[in-house]
Regions:
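Select transmembrane alpha-helical segments in multipass membrane proteins
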Residues: 1-5, 29-33, 71-84, 133-136, ...
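Inter-helical loop and helix-membrane interface segments of multi-pass membrane transporters/permeases
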Residues: 20-25, 58-78, 91-151, 180-203, ...
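Helix-loop-helix connectors at the membrane interface of multi-pass transporters/channels
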Residues: 62, 94-126, 226-230, 235, ...
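Membrane-embedded translocation segments of transport machinery
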Residues: 155, 159-303, 327-328
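A generic transmembrane alpha-helix motif of multi-pass inner-membrane proteins
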Residues: 359-384, 402-431
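Extracellular loop-to-transmembrane helix junctions
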Residues: 22-48, 130, 247, 369, ...
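Membrane-interface "cap" regions at the ends of multi-pass membrane proteins
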Residues: 1-16, 43-67, 73-77, 228-232, ...
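Transmembrane helix-boundary motif of multi-pass solute transporters/channels
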Residues: 1-37, 218-224, 234-238, 242-245, ...
Length: 431
């Protein structure tokens, strides 16, 4: 499980999305609430989801039916649809990582001109053939891993490449922090400015908490179903939350000081990391090799996370319709490709096609991170804390078991405090 957590933690969520959201939502007024939410609410909901999967021993729909009865099955369907939507836009970013890896291999990974940075990213994201082609390649690789059951091989490789990516991040952070003007980036990330706080920044921090931990759609529930009997779930969940939170902070430290050092726009949007990293590589000895290694590891990290998400939908088709894993993976991937096609075009031909100010990519991200993932975890909390609590507590009572008082506090957080907080932030963020 720790290997799973490491590949989820040090991936696109930390390196791509967290710096973008931090830059677009006021820096510290997003970062600090995220850390608090992740270590509290995130831990509670992650523990609930993994434990329910451990108890249910099946896909999210199977688990909901087995533990709660037929009236809980629609919640499982919500998770399946959420997984499809997440992978639809996530695969666009996965395609970008492959494209930047190809550029690095061809010796085009170093850029010092701001104009060239924007032009290169625009040429990739705005070209329909490139954007859709790389996305399709990324999804094909993902489907191949799931269909061919080579996930164990991927996890073994994770033991090498994920620590390698972590080390590369540390090197890039050190170099970025030595750049003139980098201190402005640190101040932006960690200096609390009350006047900059908005409910929207808290709303986005809540959404990223769910996104970064992959909770609310059944992804971690599916992985929980694979845990052997007697697993120490609480310890694993604490490690997952700790690693994920730390990786996100490191991702911001890797990007934001360089953004301010080179006078880039911190609110540049989803492409922020991709227009920043080539500048940092250009400041390093053997920068071209660093670029290849970084984007190779990042591509692998993106792939392992996408395998987790596709596994969710594949497991649903296998359990509910008794198809083979190969058939389930192919069907899921084709559906994702159809939706993902429009997500990929959201930075090119469909960039100006918007509804309420959002394009297709934005809507898929918004509906999942800020709506369906929080709602999914509210349902998980009610199921765990009210319907199956005695068995839920038993599953967590692996020696050394927590005290009775700990369980009382945990249950209070699970069914009262955390749901109330989620509802308040959801309502205020949507208004």
């Amino acid at each position: 499980m720790v290997v799973v957590s490491l590949k989820e933690a040090v991936g696109l969520g930390a390196i791509w999305k967290f710096p973008w959201l931090a830059g677009s939502n006021g820096g510290a007024v997003f970062v600090i609430p995220y850390v608090i939410l992740s270590l509290t609410l995130g831990f509670v909901f992650l523990t609930a989801e993994i434990t329910l999967g451990y108890m249910g021993r099946g896909s999210i729909v199977t688990t909901m039916r087995k533990l709660g009865g037929s009236k809980w099955v629609p919640a499982g369907y919500l998770g399946v649809v959420t997984g499809l939507l997440v992978l639809s836009f996530y695969s666009v970013i996965g395609g970008w990582t492959i494209a930047y890896l190809v550029d690095a291999i061809l010796g085009r990974g170093l850029v010092t001109s701001q104009a060239e940075l924007g032009a290169r990213f625009g040429a990739l994201s705005g070209d329909p053939l490139l954007a859709v082609g790389y996305q399709a390649l990324f999804l094909t690789l993902t489907a191949g891993v799931v269909a061919l059951k080579v996930s164990k091989g991927i996890e073994r490789l994770s033991r090498i490449l994920m620590p390698a990516l972590f080390i590369l991040m540390l090197i890039l952070i050190v170099r970025g922090l030595t750049l003139p003007g980098a201190s402005e980036g640190l101040s932006y990330l960690f200096a609390w400015k009350p006047e900059a706080f908005t409910w929207q920044s808290l709303y986005q921090a809540l959404g990223f908490t769910f996104f970064s931990l992959c909770v609310g759609c059944g992804c971690m529930m599916t992985y929980g179903s694979y845990l052997p009997q007697g697993s120490r779930i609480l310890k694993s969940c604490a490690q997952i939350v700790g690693l994920t939170t730390a990786a996100s902070i490191l991702g911001a430290l890797m990007v934001m000081p360089a953004v301010f050092a080179f006078h880039l726009d911190p609110a540049a949007g989803p492409g922020l990391t991709f227009v920043t990293m080539p500048v940092i590589f250009a400041q390093l000895p053997f920068g071209g090799l660093f670029a290849v290694a970084f984007f190779a590891c990042l591509t692998f990290a993106a792939l392992t996370s996408s395998v987790s998400m596709l596994e969710l939908d594949t497991a649903f088709l296998v359990d509910e319709f008794h198809v083979s894993r190969t058939t389930g993976a192919i069907i899921s991937t084709l559906v994702i490709m159809v939706i993902g096609f429009f997500c990929a075009l959201s930075f090119g031909p469909l960039a100006d096609t918007k509804f309420l100010g959002k394009n297709v990519f934005d809507w898929c991200d918004f509906l999942t991170s800020n709506i369906s993932l929080p709602i999914g975890d509210l349902i998980v909390a009610l199921l765990a804390g009210l319907v199956v609590w005695p068995k839920f507590r038993e599953a967590l009572s692996v020696p050394p078991a927590p005290s009775d008082q700990w369980f009382r506090i945990f249950r209070l957080l699970l069914v009262v405090a955390c749901p109330i907080l989620v509802v308040i932030v959801l309502v205020t963020g949507l208004l």
